[in-house]
Amino acid sequence: MKLFIDTANIEEIREAYALGIICGVTTNPSLIAREGRNFAQVVREIAAIVDGPISAEAVSPDAAGMIAEAEELSSIHPNIVVKIPMTAEGLKAVKILAQKGIRTNVTLIFSANQALLAARAGASYVSPFVGRLDDVSQDGAALIYDIMEIFERHCIRTEVIAASIRHPVHVTMAAKAGAHIATVPYKVLMQMIGHPLTEAGIKKFLEDWEKVKDK
């Protein structure tokens, strides 16, 4: 399973990419707004760091507006993938954008039926929101399993991005369920690195080395 980072913070992206663990970035209007900077400039800086897909969101409610935004976004850099919401208007936009060769990531997926419709409309990626389902006592991992089973059985090439990741367990669940990609916040990526037993083991090795290094 590939890992993307879910952020618009340049320093977080730079640090995660330096570790060799991410190959793409997802953003949304909230993440961009948090940085308080020009959107196009942020995207260009991201593209200079990560040579992989960069998801940026269209916010218009209607298909015509989404298409216009998508064309503008995709002109910023060839690695741009346009995030489109899972609505009827979104599906119309995805179909036309696919015909134009503009890649899309259909977001706010909460059912296997939604994922299937998005894929059939021509989405390059679908993003089921694992954490938000868990927040309302539904099974986010089960949704990934269902989508993957349907896509594999029907030879659907759309890639599945496990999104709305809250903690490292969500990443493990997504990997076990067969998701192609998990997009993970910086904080969770850092949590995945550490383990108390790893830290204790390093401390013990250093203590033992200090005892024998001068003998």
Swiss-Prot record:
GO biological process, one term: carbohydrate metabolic process
Cellular component aspect of the GO annotation: cytoplasm
GO MF, any single term: transaldolase activity
Enzyme Commission number: 2.2.1.2
UniProt keyword list: Cytoplasm, Pentose shunt, Schiff base, Transferase
Residues at the active site: 83
Catalytic function, reaction form: D-sedoheptulose 7-phosphate + D-glyceraldehyde 3-phosphate = D-erythrose 4-phosphate + beta-D-fructose 6-phosphate
Localization annotation: Cytoplasm
Pathway, per record: Carbohydrate degradation; pentose phosphate pathway; D-glyceraldehyde 3-phosphate and beta-D-fructose 6-phosphate from D-ribose 5-phosphate and D-xylulose 5-phosphate (non-oxidative stage): step 2/3
Keyword Translocase tagged: no
Chief localisation class: cytoplasm
Enzyme superclass (EC): transferase
Role summary: Transaldolase is important for the balance of metabolites in the pentose-phosphate pathway.
UniProt similarity note: Belongs to the transaldolase family. Type 3B subfamily.
HAMAP family the record matches: Transaldolase_3b
Name of protein: Probable transaldolase
